[in-house]
Swiss-Prot record:
E.C. numbers: 2.5.1.145
Transmembrane segments: 17-37, 59-79, 97-117, 129-149, 203-223, 230-250, 257-277
UniProt key word Plastid: no
Identification of the protein by name: Phosphatidylglycerol--prolipoprotein diacylglyceryl transferase
Group of enzyme by EC: transferase
Role this protein plays: Catalyzes the transfer of the diacylglyceryl group from phosphatidylglycerol to the sulfhydryl group of the N-terminal cysteine of a prolipoprotein, the first step in the formation of mature lipoproteins.
Subcellular location: Cell inner membrane
CC terms in the record's Gene Ontology section: plasma membrane
Binding-site positions, a 1,2-diacyl-sn-glycero-3-phospho-(1'-sn-glycerol): 142
Bilayer topology term: Multi-pass membrane protein
The family this protein is said to belong to: Belongs to the Lgt family.
Pathway(s) of this molecule: Protein modification; lipoprotein biosynthesis (diacylglyceryl transfer)
Encoding gene, per UniProt annotation: lgt
Length: 301
């Protein structure tokens, strides 16, 4: 059983300015996106599409705006709508935290539509190029969550080799013992709490780094190294992220103000299901469309 290091949320002190880890991870995310984007320019089939380093820089400018605005307003709408309706000015208190990936995804989608329109490209050409650049940024964001000791996982057995104690969850842990007496007795968690004043939990942020970051990046990078039908890489991203997030949510603690919803699924899982379905439909469409185009070309020749 491990204990979370309980890092200082401030990474760097610059006089009166404090650079927080989560903000630093945003910077790391966009730097990694630039690096991956530049590497993609070396692929012959990508270079043949006319992409340039300036495109990457401009794309990231749009992406930053879409991520921040979409992520914030997505959190407001999907997770705490009633609270922000009663306290509308709190919407702008971004330093207090509260970002939604699914909201950020919608924000980036809209931003890429604007970018595609400006560059006179199709939206799917842009999202296919961007898709392999995203997982590295997701991993950086989840690392920021882990450093901050937030978005921890569900309570687990103290005998699990991955079990971790999160100081920030101490108040919730005390309540968990009351609401889950049978599970607490089975795992002897009262003894653990008496010793540490915390309960062992899944480090779900690390699971997300592994699945949404490393695994999804490898899948997308390998998939997109060869020419694919327009929309295929975007579809693989939707499927891959949706499956990764849906899976990790079984180990991640649901938001305390929402809990589990219909069918015992979390909000994150319900928001991921449409991504998976849309990805499957888009992938089938992309390859069928490509097959029809190839058949028509063969007929003409």
């Amino acid at each position: 059983m491990h204990i979370h290091p309980n890092f200082d949320p401030v990474a760097i002190h610059l006089g009166p300015l404090a650079v927080r880890w989560y903000g630093l991870m945003y910077l790391v995310a966009f730097i990694m996106a630039i690096v991956v984007g530049r590497l993609r320019l070396r692929l012959p089939h990508v270079a043949a599409q006319g992409w340039t380093p300036k495109d990457i820089d401009d794309m990231l400018f749009y992406g930053v705006l879409g991520t921040i605005l979409g992520g914030r307003f997505g959190y407001v709408l999907f997770y705490k709508a009633s609270w922000y309706f009663a306290h509308p000015l709190d919407v702008f208190k971004v330093w207090e935290g509260g970002m939604s990936f699914h909201g950020g995804f919608l924000g980036v989608t809209f931003a890429m539509i604007l970018f595609a329109w400006q560059r006179k490209r199709t939206w799917l050409q842009v999202t296919d190029f961007v898709a392999p650049m995203v997982p590295a940024g997701l991993a950086a964001g989840r690392l920021g969550n882990f450093i901050n000791g937030e978005l921890w996982g569900r309570v687990t057995s103290p005998d699990a080799p991955w079990a971790m104690l999160f100081p920030g969850a101490a108040n919730e842990d005390a309540g968990w013992l009351v609401t889950h007496p049978a599970q607490a007795a089975q795992w002897h968690l009262a003894d653990v709490f008496a010793q540490y004043h915390m309960l062992p939990r899944h480090p779900s942020q690390l699971y997300e780094i592994a699945l949404e970051g490393v695994v999804l990046f490898l899948v997308l990078w390998l998939f997109s190294r060869k020419p694919r039908p327009v929309g295929a890489a975007s579809a693989v991203f939707l499927i891959g992220y949706g499956l990764a997030r849906f899976t990790v949510e079984f180990a991640r603690e649901p938001d305390d103000f929402l809990g589990l919803l219909a069918l015992g699924l979390s909000m994150g899982q319900w928001l991921s299901l449409p991504m998976i379905i849309a990805g499957v439909v888009m992938l089938l469409w992309a390859y069928r469309r490509n097959g029809r185009s190839a058949a028509q070309a063969a007929g003409v020749s």
